[in-house]
């Protein structure tokens, strides 16, 4: 895999360009999720363009409505009593994004090109055990929830990736401030969806395409890892196969 990061001149978002390649002659199971640990704001809310989600419990996976699950508005994550994952079922035509915002409208927005289709909320919940886990994992950093973005709709399986195939996508991470807050999840979702469409539209997909050329150029080596990639390339050449990503040293 390859990861390229940059900031646009005068831009407010970090660009994260990802490339995963299956160099082999066989189908491979592919799994990718980008994980963002974000502050658990008092009265904070997760906003995502979905009307349903997948969750699990009791040995089964099931579909639930969004935002109200068993009488609880899960978009306000402090309402959630225990540890749980929600994998949001984002419609094909919807923009790919997720945001964590405080009551004053400030927070983190992540959005991406269409290939990174999945979005997830994970919380430790709000009980003594969940509080202890957060203390153990973060020390002085404070309470957090996880918002994630992935290639699949859920983390319950992998996606078949065809032989000799490359998948690329572009994600952006940055601060967002929402005005005219509403207690209605639907209104907040519609407002942020419109904002992301205006911000990204087709320009994000175009940026991904336009950046392909320089992403494939050799770069300056600033740190060398282990030699196992060289060993793998030597084995591939011996088998008469193409080496791994020759533009990467």
Residue ranges and their predicted role:
Residues 248-249:
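Amphipathic alpha-helical repeat scaffolds of TPR domains
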Residues 12, 23-165, 219-221, 226-227, ...:
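A contiguous, surface-exposed recognition patch within enzymatic or periplasmic domains that forms
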